[in-house]
Amino acid sequence: MGLANDIRIRNAARGYRSCQMPNSRPIVAIVDDDEAVGNAIELLLRSIGLVAQAFSSGDEFLLSPELSRTGCLVVDFDMPKMNGLDLYANLSRLGKEIPTVLITAYPSDDIRARALQAGVICYLPKPFDESDLLDCVQTALDRAKEK
């Protein structure tokens, strides 16, 4: 059995479920300049039946045709060119209110306060427990369904 199967079994036991919007499958977009982190999160989310896609930068995500299908954004704070809060602000300016989970390897109370004040759903310092991430993604997708 591989890693994906092990994750799928653990998550099924915890009761995580796939969230779907009526008549469409929202994408969980992961934006992280660390390819290994982005791919690991993508694998985790796919293992519970979510549609997920990793992007290496905010610019790549903004130019993606998947932007319109995104129901949840998991974004790293510390990235070159455009950090996670800047990406969130750019999306807001474009009228794209995407429920967002901000992750960071360099946690600070200031960034946490700014993120939550801006409207970010969850703030997770790396390394985080996969169940915490899944709870945040679940909350974000539930919020997206309300819109």
What are these regions (language model features)?
Residues 138-147:
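The C-terminal output helix
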Residues 56-57, 83-87:
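Acidic catalytic/metal-coordinating carboxylates
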Residues 86, 107-122:
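Alpha4 helix (beta4-alpha4-beta5 surface) of REC/receiver domains from two-component response regulators
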Residues 54-72:
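Acidic, metal-coordinating helix/loop segments flanking the phosphotransfer/catalytic sites
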Residues 35-53:
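Two-component/phosphorelay signaling modules centered on CheY-like receiver
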